[in-house]
Amino acid sequence: MNNGILHQNYNSKKFDIIKISLASPEVIRSWSHGEVKKPETINYRTFKPERDGLFCAKIFGPIKDYECLCGKYKRLKHRGVVCERCGVEVEQAKVRRERMGHIDLVCPVVHIWYLKSLPSRIGLFLDMPLKNVEKVLYFESYIVTDPGMTPLEKKQLLTDEEYAEALENYGYEFEASMGAEAIRDLLADTDIESEIELLQAECEESKSTAKKEKAIKRLRLLETFQASGNKPEWMVMTVLPVLPPDLRPLVPIEGGRFATSDLNDLYRRVINRNNRLKKLLDLNAPDIIVRNEKRMLQEAVDALLDNGRRGRAVTGSNKRPLKSLADMIKGKQGRFRQNLLGKRVDYSGRSVITVGPSLRLHECGLPKKMALELFKPFVYSKLRLGGHATTIKQAKRMVELEEAVVWDILETVINEHPVLLNRAPTLHRLGIQAFEPRLIEGKAIQLHPLVCAAFNADFDGDQMAVHVPLTVESQLEARVLMMSTNNILSPASGQPIITPTQDIVLGLYYITREKEGARGEGKLFSSYEDVSRAYNSGTIDIHAKIKLRIDRQVFDTKGNTYNEKGVVNTTVGRALLLNILPEGLSFSLLNKVLVKKEISKIINQAFRVLGGKATVVLADKLMYAGFKYSTLSGVSVGVDDMTIPDNKEAKIEEAEKEIKQITEQYQSSLITENERYNNIINIWSKTSDEVGASMMDAISKDTVSINGEKKEIESFNSVYMMAKSGARGSYNQMRQLAGMRGLMAKPDGTMIETAITANFREGLSVLQYFTSTHGARKGLADTALKTANAGYLTRRLVDVAQDLVVIEEDCGTDDGLMFSAIVEDGEVKVPLVERALGRTLAADVVTEKGVVLLEAGTLLDENLVELLDDNGIDMIKVRSPITCKTRRGLCAKCYGRDLARERQVNVGESVGVIAAQSIGEPGTQLTMRTFHTGGAASLGITVSDIKVKTAGKIKFKNIRTVTNKEGQEIVISRAGEIIVSDTMGRVREQHKIPMGAVVPLASGKAVEIGDVIATWDPHAQPLITDVAGKVVLEDVIDGITSKHTYDDLTGQQTIEITSISQRTTSKNLKPVVKIVDEKGAELKSIPLAVGAVLNVADDSILEVGDIVAKIPLEGSKNKDITGGLPRVAELFEARRPKDAAILSPCDGMVRLGNRDTKEKQRIEIIDKNGHIVEEILLPKSRHLVVFDGEQVSRGDVLADGPTDPHDLLKYKGLEEFADYILIEAQSVYRMQGVVINDKHIETIVRQMLRKAVILDEGDSKFVKDESIELVRILEENDKLRKQGKKEVEYELVLMGITRSSLSTESFLSAASFQETTRVLTEASINSQIDNLRGLKENVLIGRLIPTGTGLAVRKESAKIEKMREELGVEDNMVFTDLSSFNPEEISFDSIQSQKEDKDINEDIEESLRNALESLDF
């Protein structure tokens, strides 16, 4: 890197990679244009920079363009001359942004990043603790650099006294010194190769894991130094580079003061101390003073590089810490995130938005003033081309005066020139869309109501920004890709996002309602026109039931056409809507009461059958109709619309009576405090539900008299209609308005037991108001926290997935995931049809008869998934991003359908970012609160049996049963399920069956709706014996491991097992029930968990299926279930839960009770020959779910607890793990009613599995047990396979999204995410190369990103490069793709020898540049 760096043209095409490494003193000097010797900045009288100071013009270049400091040389003609008076080179002033200087340090100084950024690189390299290195550096201790023949050891620390003593004893036979010089000498003296050999030997021989790990770390570091060409002594600086002055400016402000960058202060401290040290050394000052000065110099450089990293931060005059070089690049305000990833853009404006109900979907209203400002350059050029102005200056004046012709020209300029509208926060790609502007008066931007959902905008003062795409390419992209009419479907779920809401829904609902006995009822009309005429003349009512003759053509999704003919029963309103229904859609879609869901269905159907264009037109027409009729309906909220039910008071009195009884029971100690609270909560929630129900009854029905006869009809109450249609409000809100408010939650989620009996119409008393403030405030606080958290989750997701792009058509794998319907609580929540839509099959789908229904590789569309459903297929194998074999990207087949476009995804689509946005965007809707089970949150009555909801057959899965003496079948397995399938064999229900349940029917039996297929005790889990024999109680000692309780009322005795923590002695006793035969041989032993209540006495006789003990379920209930946003973050961060379930690491037999320690119990897993394969130590408080002698398979649960995703992946495999994350994440979103396609979650999971751990290094350079990018292992294996060597064996490792982002191959991407210092430190030592593959890296260096149209451009230029290389073409020759070559198109007079042109071109370019610079552009 020489001075040429400054004069080269920064052409972004010229480099393919960026490398970061340590700079040697020679390199730093080669960057520099001179040494900065003085701390002065500028002369305060003349405002000229001081010579040799921090702003010296001689070093850094002139202050004014092409003018030396003393003014002897001015103008362009002297370019390149160095003035002999002031020594300044005549050059452009902008070189002051790029020319660096340097400071020669009198003594070496350690770079703080390599010292303090953990793990300390210098400490690790020298194999010294950080504390010791610091002692040497900051002149507290001496370090022996060369022990000579003395008994001292190398790197031994000596205090001043010890050093003096050693000098006395050994004289100058040894060398010891302090400060950075000593460290530098030690670093330089290290023989890296021999150290590496020693460490490799140590790794192989060492028995202790800790030693081995440390050796591996050190070995890695030494190897990187060896491989990267960095010298370790470069971590200690002898020359300090000085930043160009224009990057640390000093600006005069009024009042004769200066605003300066903190860096100048920091540099001045360094220079001052450096100069003082130089003087002290020249004067031969006493050692202690020199030492102190050296320490201060070290501290000054530390502060410059990273202020506050060590000791107290250096503060400026205003007591705040100075901003060092490290602070400049890190954090949200740092260089990476503020200036490189997010730049401000020109040609943009922002204003408040208002509603534009008369716009078409692809239009937006743009205020005239704003448009004129935005399109100024276009207007100028049109004014000149049209001959209205001769110069730009004149055009400028015309625009300023706003002459009439300007507006006409603006109209033509704006025509078909799309603009981008953006609303912050832009949470997903639909937050920026393109519209065609329509000029409007006023100052607010008008927005089409249907795109509000995508922008999440409303008109209560929201602002939006407008951006103008300038180039033809960008206009084309805006029109084709970003136009609102091309973004009908949401990329997250594939459902329409432009569905009508609020007023529109209300209007459509209102006119499609029917009313008994309305004017004109029963009339027959022959066409829409007749109805319209009759309605307009006032002879029929809009809600009247009529008959209408129709004759339409209808298309279905398979492309068939059929006729819809005949007379239909309908209403006037629905007939009026017939006019806007396009040809091809059935009238039956409209011929019903249109609530929000139904309107969505119409739009969905239109898109599937008629395509985008017709859908957009339909949506617009529906919107106009909705607005028109909601205005005409006159629906509004009045206080009388809130009907309070008559029986409210009675219900409340009844509840208060019950509560009084319960309180009395509590006072006479019949029930516990907990029971009292739960009962009261139950009473109030039941009462408020009942009051709500009778309020709904009153509000939803009206009594009218038709022909003197009274009739009940559905009400036209405004509040009811708003809620019923889905326009605004909900049942719950109506209940609070006119029923009773009910129970309020405290901030911790528990309910306050005094319910609010009033409603908002009656008004709340002061006390009631106070009670309700609790929950309301929690809501507000939550919302504020939630938004920040959701934003941060999105950022982490985007960062981990940003470089995942579809880069090829097909990777050719037949791997995939098994998909079946998602079943929760026995109900099918997501049918297979929905999950399979838009996926590619990984294996043939075969019917029960063995017929291949669909072949592998088929992309499933709507018609094909219906085919699956019709044939009763309930499980298929689909390709998935997780199992895709494409490296550094994805293939289109594994991803499947692009949800927003309804066809296979294009190569170049950045699916990673789309996935991150789809998961992050609904994050703000997810609740923050953790759901509490128990108390009022789970008000459901406890379930104790299962009734079938569909007729069909039942099938047992993993169920073992025994028959007890009453002849009942008792379930003795833990994770059993009963599956109910219909007559076609499709799974319709799936129920988990607890241990101890009674199953009346056998597997394979037919069932009808309502049949009970299992019953159990909901309050306790029984321990059941599957052998008969005599009971022997072991370690059940009254007062130590168990406690006897005697109930006075019932006279019952119970024995309950106490917990280990309650015992004072005998902590290693383990209560067990053993069952023995007549000879006393043990048949079975059942360990008793804490809280178990014994059902048997010692020596009693048991039959098969008898209950040995019961564990009350109150105690073993789950802890709080984390819900909402924290749960999603927990899943993607792959956090290990506390007290996670312990899974069996291998197959074998469980052996318990051997060699238990004081605190821990030992589980041994033995193979067939009785050898111990695995041992697991667990705290004694953990409850085991396996018995001694039980056979287990790899991945079976040994001790229960929440699932640990890491163990799941390790022991159960990729598919189980993927399934777990998918189902868990989806259940959180489903709870909030958010639809997200599975493939987005799979895409993120793929990025969490980027690394693998080496099990066997084979013939590679890798080391066993280190974790490496999977791609690198696969590439290495390819090489080894070709050479016929032994391949690497590895196992996938799970990483959370934050760790995964930080350990990406690209250091630019990682550094701009988090922990910038650590990432750059590591990268520079490794001399890391960034291949600029991802999106982020390319944004940083200002290139087109390699995705979408950018990928096409990149591929094209790569092709051209390759052709150039093959043909040996020079850079300045131009050629095009010859396939599109047409000789007739060439005009021969334009062709000249390029060589001659080159010189002329340069001259023209030169004069042009100067001309432009003289103009004030």
From Swiss-Prot:
EC number from the UniProt entry: 2.7.7.6
Top enzyme category: transferase
GO MF annotation: an example: DNA-directed RNA polymerase activity
Pfam family, any one: RNA_pol_Rpb1_4
Gene3D superfamilies per record: 1.10.132.30, 1.10.150.390, 1.10.1790.20, 1.10.40.90, 2.40.40.20, 2.40.50.100, RNA polymerase II, clamp domain, RNA polymerase Rpb1, domain 3
Substrates-to-products reaction catalysed: RNA(n) + a ribonucleoside 5'-triphosphate = RNA(n+1) + diphosphate
Annotated residues for binding of Zn(2+) 1: C68, C70, C83, C86
Cofactor binding comment, as recorded: Binds 1 Mg(2+) ion per subunit. Binds 2 Zn(2+) ions per subunit.
InterPro entries on file: DNA-dir_RpoC_beta_prime, DNA-dir_RpoC_beta_prime_bact, RNA_pol_asu, RNA_pol_N, RNA_pol_Rpb1_1, RNA_pol_Rpb1_3, RNA_pol_Rpb1_3_sf, RNA_pol_Rpb1_4
Keyword annotations: DNA-directed RNA polymerase, Magnesium, Metal-binding, Nucleotidyltransferase, Transcription, Transferase, Zinc
Function comment: DNA-dependent RNA polymerase catalyzes the transcription of DNA into RNA using the four ribonucleoside triphosphates as substrates.
Binding partners and assembly: The RNAP catalytic core consists of 2 alpha, 1 beta, 1 beta' and 1 omega subunit. When a sigma factor is associated with the core the holoenzyme is formed, which can initiate transcription.
Protein name: DNA-directed RNA polymerase subunit beta'
Naturally occurring in which organism (per UniProt): Francisella tularensis subsp. tularensis (strain SCHU S4 / Schu 4)
Taxonomic classification: Bacteria, Pseudomonadati, Pseudomonadota, Gammaproteobacteria, Thiotrichales
